[in-house]
Design a protein with these regions (language model features):
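Conserved beta-loop-beta connector loops within the AMP-binding
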Residues: 1-23, 42, 60-61, 124-128, ...
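Generic structural signal for residues in well-ordered beta-strands
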Residues: 2, 99, 148-150
């Protein structure tokens, strides 16, 4: 069995087409984590539904489209914002070679999207205003990038994937260095 639930309220089941956390149940689903009752309780509901940690949507035909990991979702001014959707829109820009979007602290909205971009060789510099103009109409206003950092290279994991974890750590260190005291 497969269903979608609200990320912020797992008791609320979602209709087809809505983004939410995918949950599965059946004889092929584990009963819990070995010797870890706390992790088991967090991942499994009392009636056996396993929370996958994937944000996805199920269409009317039953096809599942995975959008993001729950842990990567941003909460911006009360809206669930999925960095992958923003990244896809930025990749449509003809001068962008690589992009990684993370959430940064925002005193008013909680979090705001920040894009780290590596431009293609020979591309003209890209400004935040130009990127926002490009994204207008491609993503929602609540998803709009609020900060941009151009880089010659983006950090990667040992297997070559872009590393959001490294960018979050850099931002954490930057915020700590800027903090008073």
């Amino acid at each position: 069995e497969l269903r979608g639930v609200a990320v912020d309220d797992p008791s609320r089941e979602l209709a087809a087409g809505e983004h939410g956390e995918r949950c599965i149940r059946g004889p092929n689903v584990m009963r819990g984590y070995w010797n870890s009752p706390a992790a088991s309780a967090a991942a499994l509901s009392a009636d056996g539904w396993f929370r996958t940690g994937d944000v996805a949507r199920i269409d009317e035909a039953g096809y599942v489209y995975i959008v993001e990991r729950c842990k990567d979702m941003l909460l911006c001014g009360g809206f669930n914002v999925y960095p992958t959707i923003i990244e896809e829109a930025i990749y449509a820009h003809p001068d962008v070679a690589e992009v990684c979007v993370i959430g940064i602290a925002d005193a008013y909205r909680g979090q705001s999207p920040k894009a780290f971009v590596r431009l293609k060789d020979g591309a003209a510099p890209l400004t935040l205003a130009a990127l926002q103009a490009f994204l207008e109409g491609r993503i929602g206003r609540h998803e709009m990038v609020r900060a941009l950092e151009l880089r010659a290279e983006l950090p990667k994991t040992p297997v070559g994937k872009l590393s959001k974890l490294a960018l979050y750590e850099e931002e954490r260190q930057r915020a700590a260095a800027a903090a008073p005291g």
